[in-house]
């Protein structure tokens, strides 16, 4: 009976505390940050908590709920990004597996480092950008996070309605730091097209990359479509940074016409005349519209001689291809890396590819053989700067393995196919020239 009365008395105290008389300000000794106020219960003064301003949260008001980007290297980033660059969820800093790592929520300096009872990305050890622990198989790995640098997020000065197609121009300057390479956003490669194939039942899978050469035309590789040549099977996305989720401002297109090169052939390894054209049209009947994330790429000039950059030139490749040839899945985030053009004399040496490489092809590789195009990058762009304009110099075609020594990536040499492109697109307005 006494125990019951004591329990009822405790309930009365708790209820009365919840009816407006529970809060009593105490000295700010509970570590509240960002203007938070340390509070306690009127009847249980040993229980403290932080009353946070509207845009902050967390036990100590240390989480900035309004922060969507990081500054510098992100050491002081306190936002709520919680996935890595492949879309995998971060582990909580107070989870049992993370408590065995160097950085976790139970460290004496956890609050200063932004660590706590959450799984938000942080940079406690001053790496180049925010990161988190991710469960990969049986291991917990440090992975960079899907959050952009504030310096890369500046809005264009011109309103969208004033934008026009200006081939080879982009709003962001890439930071070079596919196999190796760096995750990027579509603003760095706004001409990149992601091509998917429909399956019975409604599912879609990523097939290949492509490049927007005019508002209505995307160029890619014939080998991507040779086994399934029906145009109705394909859809094309422009302005997309992630493989299986939407990007703000992206556009979706049906394929109105699919043109495969009539002289395409494939040997044991090499692909010849590996080029294709896709005429795109939205359900509303429109071609692509220029934006911060959608832009055309320049084609080589038909009147320059030579019309390709010199061997040794650094060029960019972009795609959703596998990071290693043994990987089962494609990465979720778009990747970009830099390779250098390799001379035909070198690429035709016996320990490279010998006679399999023709003058309608280009070779490109990383001098250290650490980065390369790989499975899934096919059809995507090899882009080089020519007279200040990013120019489609090659199309990802074939190669042996990925980033193997003396086995560079081989690309369709776009300059050799300009008459073919123009004869089919009949673009004479300068956008595809």
Curated annotation (Swiss-Prot):
<feature type="disulfide bond">
    <location>
        <begin position="121"/>
        <end position="145"/>
    </location>
</feature>
<keyword id="KW-0597">Phosphoprotein</keyword>
<keyword id="KW-1015">Disulfide bond</keyword>
<feature type="domain" description="EGF-like">
    <location>
        <begin position="26"/>
        <end position="62"/>
    </location>
</feature>
<feature type="disulfide bond">
    <location>
        <begin position="347"/>
        <end position="363"/>
    </location>
</feature>
<feature type="disulfide bond">
    <location>
        <begin position="69"/>
        <end position="150"/>
    </location>
</feature>
<feature type="disulfide bond">
    <location>
        <begin position="90"/>
        <end position="132"/>
    </location>
</feature>
<dbReference type="GO" id="GO:0031639">
    <property type="term" value="P:plasminogen activation"/>
</dbReference>
<feature type="disulfide bond" description="Interchain (between A and B chains)">
    <location>
        <begin position="167"/>
        <end position="298"/>
    </location>
</feature>
<feature type="disulfide bond">
    <location>
        <begin position="374"/>
        <end position="402"/>
    </location>
</feature>
<keyword id="KW-0245">EGF-like domain</keyword>
<dbReference type="Pfam" id="PF00089">
    <property type="entry name" value="Trypsin"/>
</dbReference>
<feature type="disulfide bond">
    <location>
        <begin position="208"/>
        <end position="224"/>
    </location>
</feature>
<dbReference type="InterPro" id="IPR018056">
    <property type="entry name" value="Kringle_CS"/>
</dbReference>
<feature type="disulfide bond">
    <location>
        <begin position="30"/>
        <end position="38"/>
    </location>
</feature>
<dbReference type="GO" id="GO:0042730">
    <property type="term" value="P:fibrinolysis"/>
</dbReference>
<comment type="similarity">
    <text>Belongs to the peptidase S1 family.</text>
</comment>
<dbReference type="InterPro" id="IPR013806">
    <property type="entry name" value="Kringle-like"/>
</dbReference>
<feature type="modified residue" description="Phosphoserine">
    <location>
        <position position="325"/>
    </location>
</feature>
<comment type="function">
    <text>Specifically cleaves the zymogen plasminogen to form the active enzyme plasmin.</text>
</comment>
<keyword id="KW-0617">Plasminogen activation</keyword>
<dbReference type="InterPro" id="IPR009003">
    <property type="entry name" value="Peptidase_S1_PA"/>
</dbReference>
<feature type="domain" description="Kringle">
    <location>
        <begin position="69"/>
        <end position="150"/>
    </location>
</feature>
<feature type="domain" description="Peptidase S1">
    <location>
        <begin position="178"/>
        <end position="426"/>
    </location>
</feature>
<dbReference type="Pfam" id="PF00051">
    <property type="entry name" value="Kringle"/>
</dbReference>
<keyword id="KW-0720">Serine protease</keyword>
<protein>
    <recommendedName>
        <fullName>Urokinase-type plasminogen activator</fullName>
        <ecNumber>3.4.21.73</ecNumber>
    </recommendedName>
</protein>
<feature type="modified residue" description="Phosphoserine">
    <location>
        <position position="157"/>
    </location>
</feature>
<feature type="active site" description="Charge relay system">
    <location>
        <position position="223"/>
    </location>
</feature>
<feature type="active site" description="Charge relay system">
    <location>
        <position position="378"/>
    </location>
</feature>
<dbReference type="InterPro" id="IPR001254">
    <property type="entry name" value="Trypsin_dom"/>
</dbReference>
<keyword id="KW-0378">Hydrolase</keyword>
<dbReference type="InterPro" id="IPR000001">
    <property type="entry name" value="Kringle"/>
</dbReference>
<dbReference type="GO" id="GO:0005615">
    <property type="term" value="C:extracellular space"/>
</dbReference>
<feature type="disulfide bond">
    <location>
        <begin position="32"/>
        <end position="50"/>
    </location>
</feature>
<feature type="disulfide bond">
    <location>
        <begin position="216"/>
        <end position="287"/>
    </location>
</feature>
<keyword id="KW-0645">Protease</keyword>
<keyword id="KW-0865">Zymogen</keyword>
<dbReference type="InterPro" id="IPR033116">
    <property type="entry name" value="TRYPSIN_SER"/>
</dbReference>
<feature type="glycosylation site" description="N-linked (GlcNAc...) asparagine">
    <location>
        <position position="324"/>
    </location>
</feature>
<dbReference type="InterPro" id="IPR043504">
    <property type="entry name" value="Peptidase_S1_PA_chymotrypsin"/>
</dbReference>
<dbReference type="GO" id="GO:0004252">
    <property type="term" value="F:serine-type endopeptidase activity"/>
</dbReference>
